[in-house]
């Protein structure tokens, strides 16, 4: 499979991630423009700028069987996986052409959380070694080691860990391979590291200087509005999240 085919598959597979809500939504009527096209999304940098990002998965191969996910191991979809240098090269090419100002990188979980996280970190490492100074948002993989979370945080501008669903009961129902602790633990670790390095600039020992965020799937389970709002407020208070 060539690089363009991988980009087509993995850009499309990433477009419904709510952390970049400018893509994945359809428009009706006769106006021009399309927000449903995969590949480019918009986010807010630490200094308040709105930046255009290449939004893509490292791979849509996944060992998990989450009922809400298009890339579930049970689903019959076209699969692809980048090599780290391929995705780094694409990002640099798009950046030099002024198509994007940064990268939003997520992934399915292939082989193990640590293996997947290592491959994603390698993409970031290549970019920074090639003096890429653009914005990077990386989705941390629940279950990955703290050592890998540390490596990612020193390379990225923002990190996020998806809380996925409002309760452990909901996780058991729709994402039985995941647990609340595997999600909350990395959130807490990232919060601690951000606090320890607060005020330092990226490249001078800063850790995820634009903070961390998360997302929750609403409406797929019987959790009440009160539960969801209480959870969101608790996440903001305990983990100093930039956005839920």
Label for each model-derived stretch:
Residues 74, 108, 164:
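Flexible loop residues that form catalytic
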Residues 6, 65, 99-101, 132, ...:
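Short loop/turn motifs at secondary-structure junctions
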Residues 56-85:
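Canonical Radical SAM [4Fe-4S] cluster-binding loop centered on the CxxxCxxC motif
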Residues 55-56, 85-96, 199:
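Short, charged beta->alpha transition segments
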């Amino acid at each position: 499979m060539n690089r363009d085919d991988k980009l087509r598959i993995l850009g499309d597979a990433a477009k419904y991630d709510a952390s970049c809500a400018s893509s994945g939504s359809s428009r009706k009527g006769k106006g021009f423009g399309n927000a449903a096209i995969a590949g480019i999304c918009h986010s807010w940098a630490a200094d308040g700028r709105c930046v255009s990002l290449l939004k893509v998965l490292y791979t849509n191969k996944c060992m998990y069987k989450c009922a809400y996910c298009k890339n579930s191991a049970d689903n019959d979809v076209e699969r692809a996986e980048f090599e780290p240098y391929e995705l780094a090269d694409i990002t640099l090419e798009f950046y030099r052409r002024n198509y994007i100002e940064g990268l939003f990188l997520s992934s399915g979980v292939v082989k193990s959380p640590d293996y997947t996280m290592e491959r994603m970190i390698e993409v970031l490492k290549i970019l920074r070694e090639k003096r890429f100074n653009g914005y990077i948002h990386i989705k941390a993989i629940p279950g990955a080691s703290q050592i890998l979370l540390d490596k990612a945080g020193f390379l990225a501008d923002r990190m996020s860990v998806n809380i996925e669903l409002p309760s452990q009961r909901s996780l058991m129902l729709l994402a039985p391979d995941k647990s609340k602790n595997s999600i909350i633990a990395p959130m807490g670790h990232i919060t601690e590291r951000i606090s320890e390095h607060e005020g330092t600039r990226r490249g001078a020992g800063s850790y995820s200087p634009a903070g961390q965020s998360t997302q929750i799937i609403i409406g797929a389970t019987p959790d009440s509005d009160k539960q969801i709002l209480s959870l969101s407020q608790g996440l903001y208070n305990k983990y100093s999240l930039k956005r839920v």
